[in-house]
Amino acid sequence: MATIAPYELGDWLRIEPREVEREALKEIADPEVYFVAGPSFTIKDDGSPVVCGGIHIRGDGGGDAWLFASTWIERHIMVARLVRDFMLAVVDDYQLKWLQVIVDTRFPKTLRWLGWLKFTYWASLEHRAKYHIYRRKF
């Protein structure tokens, strides 16, 4: 049975990442520092982490959303609802005006999921053509 709990240091290390996460790790010097830079959560299945996510709170009224998941996420629609509810609660608690996420465009499932969460294309990263920024205003 899946449960959601506050993120604990090292939870992400116990997840067998999907290809999209393995690619993202190549771009992040120290993921743990980023993962604890704001409210975050871990979804566990039978006590083992399968999804971690959170929002890095910025000083300009916005936040950077992140998600680190195993293939488990693709079999459980309830994760989308949990992530949406977490996101909306953080936006409300911190009175955020917008959220953004950097997306590897080679993974269409991620783009569809962001559409469901009402994020839209905002910009491309000049130095990394395969990455786009998607944003949602509140």
What does each of the following model-derived ranges do?
Residues L96-G115, L125-R128:
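Conserved beta-strand-loop-alpha-helix junction that forms the acyl-donor binding cleft
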Residues T71-D85:
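Conserved glycine-rich acetyl-CoA-binding loop
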Residues D60-E74, H132:
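Conserved acetyl-CoA binding element of GNAT-fold acetyltransferases
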Residues T42, G47-I57, G62-W66:
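Conserved beta-strand in the GNAT
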Residues M1-A29:
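Short amphipathic alpha-helix that is part of the acyltransferase structural core
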Residues H127-F138:
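C-terminal "cap" of GNAT-fold acetyltransferases
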Residues E32-T42, S48-V51, Q95:
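A short helix-loop-beta-strand connector motif used in the catalytic cores of GNAT acetyltransferases and
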Residues L82-W98:
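Conserved acyl-CoA
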